[in-house]
Amino acid sequence: MGRGKIEIKRIENATNRQVTFSKRRGGLLKKANELAVLCDARVGVVIFSSTGKMFEYCSPTCSLRELIEHYQTVTNTHFEEINHDQQIFVEMTRMRNEMEKLDGGIRRFTGDDLSNLTLADINDLEQQLEFSVTKVRARKHQLLNQQLDNLRRKEHILEDQNSFLCRMINENHHQAAVGGGDVKAMVEMAPVLSMLTAAPAYYGEESSSTALQLTPPLHAVDAAAAAGFRLQPTQPNLQDPGCSSSSFHAAAAGHGLQLW
């Protein structure tokens, strides 16, 4: 029973196409070898698959190069030899022309080479420069607005800190006044007052809405605290002769101090 005829057309299925290629390639190379051996013929076969892979066969009595040279001699055809030096020269010339063109454009934009420009070219150049200046100014204003926003945020933060510290000072003054001069509150507020006193040096000499206005100042608080009470050393030889023990205890009790 004979095989049915296969329609000669491209096989659409990739797997079937690859299988058919492998079978037909093997058969073709086998036939070429049989022809070269049986008939003492000079046979050369070069095959490229659809993926670009190369397969070749040449009869044992010669090389593929010899077959190609013989083919050129018989048909009087010659393959064009590639002159790499010529290709390099052409590429260098193209790059040199491109560099000169770019350099000329830079000189025109900087105003160093305007002698060869016509009136229309100068008008086009002017429009391009004005467009570039507009873009630069827009970017400049954007950066300035960002800096202003950052400064405003910092100002609000400093104002909040200033308000918080002022409230703390007022509350401690109020507690000290109600408690009859609470020395402990004054001592606790000393680091805060020192920090607030040093604030102008930290933020600079400029006057702003964030400057701290303190009432009373630190030296006034220290003077009031010193005038409100007087402590005597515990050792007898260091005590003030003019201050008796009873008066000392009374003064300490009046100011809310506990003696250990």
Curated annotation (Swiss-Prot):
It comes from the Eukaryota. PROSITE patterns: K_BOX, MADS_BOX_1, MADS_BOX_2. Probable transcription factor. It is found in: Nucleus. This is MADS-box transcription factor 29. Expressed in developing seeds. Its main location: nucleus. GO terms for cellular component: nucleus. Keywords: DNA-binding, Nucleus, Transcription, Transcription regulation. Residues 85-175 form the K-box domain. The gene is MADS29. The keyword Nuclease does not apply. Residues 1-61 form the MADS-box domain. The lineage of its organism: Eukaryota, Viridiplantae, Streptophyta, Embryophyta, Tracheophyta. One of its GO terms (molecular function) is RNA polymerase II cis-regulatory region sequence-specific DNA binding. GO terms for biological process: positive regulation of programmed cell death; positive regulation of transcription by RNA polymerase II; regulation of transcription by RNA polymerase II; seed development; starch biosynthetic process.
